[in-house]
Curated annotation (Swiss-Prot):
The active site is at residue 237. The gene is rhaB. It comes from Klebsiella pneumoniae (strain 342). This is Rhamnulokinase. Pfam families: FGGY_C, FGGY_N. It catalyses: L-rhamnulose + ATP = L-rhamnulose 1-phosphate + ADP + H(+). It comes from the Bacteria.
Length: 488
């Protein structure tokens, strides 16, 4: 019985992991084991919020070396990360400056300038991507305006996962699913849109042709001298998470729940009609030519910040205390850009409630209750928008990613959306990363086959909607309200 060993490097905004997957083709058994975990945080450099990619590279290499030290022969490696951020390289392949985080405020006002100069409808017609103030489209314009000295030194721009693949292999690659998050890929041609790039001022020569997931970028030479293929997986972490979502049929929606919440459905065609533009829906690239028609929601970033500020270490204890509180006393619009990166998330939530003339949450449990209720109600609104867009209701919602461990939020989501929820797998991004590697190794034929492997191996939990819950009764009152978009 053959066993394949694939390594997934999964980088998030607050932490990174090197995970080892073992796959037995006979029983189609798939197991995951964490090899190395490390923190990831922003550092202030010359007034910008930057990623310490040198430290991250060191941690990635350490994790890979740990696998090799155990005598395991790695069959392949794949890397997935968050989207939109990039690294500049010079002609010698050396890094130019530090990559600036999407949470930095350098792009302030640039989205509005783009709309005024290019037209909102025209940008959407070309890209099909949701308007977010930190998209690479606006980041590059900020670079050209604020750091022209770096522009003259640069020869290439690589998105974060492609940069780390380059550091392991020495080969350049521009992976398609992540490239689409930039708002710079033409939705009709799957290549870089020259009109949009020209607006940024960045040269087209910085970018190579986007390639769909599944190609071997190059090889990493392990300490023992073995040449290990580095696969271009669906390198946007949400694209990987969707691959691992065990969607039963085309009437199932997904919610990738983590720092960001991304809710959507799969489609063979993009949705770029006026209604999609009005709803600020995104059409990001997926595997096998599928589109991830979805909407970005601020997600558990709010909770992560509150936990840190309130010095909460027992999350499950907090959730239990939160569940005992009445629902829907404190309501915020989680997609208001005031929550992107405030000095104090707790104070910002309190200020938002105060501004709305509501009771103000004081304790950590009240703040968490505010976040959970507000997210669940926003999930319901977005799910309705998506159903209206496709002209059909959804039969089921799959919640995947780290956030699916929050049973209270899962039940609130089921109640608010009035739909059956299936939670799991937790390690969705890692599993989707592994799935593309297994397809590249010819162990599996396609995404649907891999999803069956996920169903057979992952722990899944069902949540049935309760129409008599407090939040279900509140939905009718919440739905007509307008929420702000992140581009406001």
């Amino acid at each position: 019985m053959s066993i394949r060993h694939c390594v997934a490097v999964d980088l998030g905004a607050s932490s990174g992991r090197v995970m080892l997957a073992s796959y037995q083709s006979g029983p189609r058994a798939l197991t995951l084991r964490e090899i190395h975990r490390f923190t990831n945080s922003l550092q202030k450099v010359d007034g910008f919020d930057c990623w310490d990619v040198d430290s991250l590279e060191g941690e990635i290499r350490r994790g890979l070396e740990k696998v090799c030290e155990q005598g395991i022969l790695i069959d392949s490696i794949g890397i997935d990360t968050w989207g939109v951020d990039y690294v500049l390289l010079d002609k010698q392949g050396q890094r130019v400056g530090l990559p600036i985080s999407y949470r930095d405020d350098r792009t302030q006002g640039l989205l509005r300038h783009a709309e005024e100069q290019l037209g909102r409808a025209e940008i959407y017609r070309r890209s099909g991507i949701q308007f977010l103030p930190f998209n690479t489209l606006y980041q590059l314009r900020a670079l050209v305006e604020q750091q022209p000295e770096l522009v003259s030194q640069a020869a290439h721009a690589l998105l974060i996962p492609d940069y780390f693949s380059f550091r392991l292999t020495g080969n350049l690659n521009w992976e398609y699913t992540n490239a689409t998050t930039t708002q710079l890929v033409n939705i009709n041609s799957d290549s870089w849109d020259e009109t949009l790039l020209n607006w940024t001022g960045a040269p087209l020569a910085w970018f190579g042709t986007p390639t769909h997931p599944g190609n071997v970028i190059g090889h990493w030479i392990c300490p023992q001298g073995n040449r290990i293929p580095v696969v271009a997986v669906a390198s946007h972490d949400t694209a990987s998470a969707v691959i691992a979502s065990p969607l039963a049929d085309r009437h199932a929606a997904y919610l990738s729940s983590g720092t960001w919440s991304l809710m959507g459905f799969e489609s063979l065609t993009p949705y770029t009609c006026d209604a999609a533009l009005q709803a600020n829906i995104t059409n990001e690239g997926g595997a096998e030519g599928r589109y991830r028609v979805l909407k970005n929601i601020m997600g558990l970033w709010l909770l992560q910040r509150v936990l840190k500020e309130q010095h909460v270490s027992d999350l499950q204890g907090l959730i239990a205390r939160t569940a005992a509180l009445p629902a829907c006393r404190f309501m915020i619009d989680c997609n208001d850009d005031r929550f992107i990166n405030p000095a104090s998330m707790s104070a910002e939530i309190q200020a938002a409630c105060r501004d709305a003339g509501q009771p103000v949450p004081e304790s950590d449990a009240e703040l968490a209750r505010c976040i959970f209720d507000s997210l669940a109600l926003l999930y319901a609104r977005v799910l309705n928008e998506l159903a209206a867009l496709r002209g059909q209701p959804f039969s089921q919602l799959h919640i995947v990613g780290g956030g699916c461990q929050n049973a209270l939020l899962n039940q609130l989501c089921a109640d608010a959306c009035g739909i059956a929820v299936v939670a799991g797998p937790i390690e969705a991004s890692t599993l989707g990363n592994i799935g593309i590697q297994l397809m590249t190794l010819d162990e599996l034929a396609n995404v649907d086959e891999f999803r069956q492997v996920v169903r057979d191996n992952a722990a899944l939990t069902a949540f049935t909607p309760n129409p008599d819950s407090e939040i279900a009764r509140f939905v009718a009152q919440f739905q007509p309200q307008q929420t702000k978009e992140l581009c406001a």
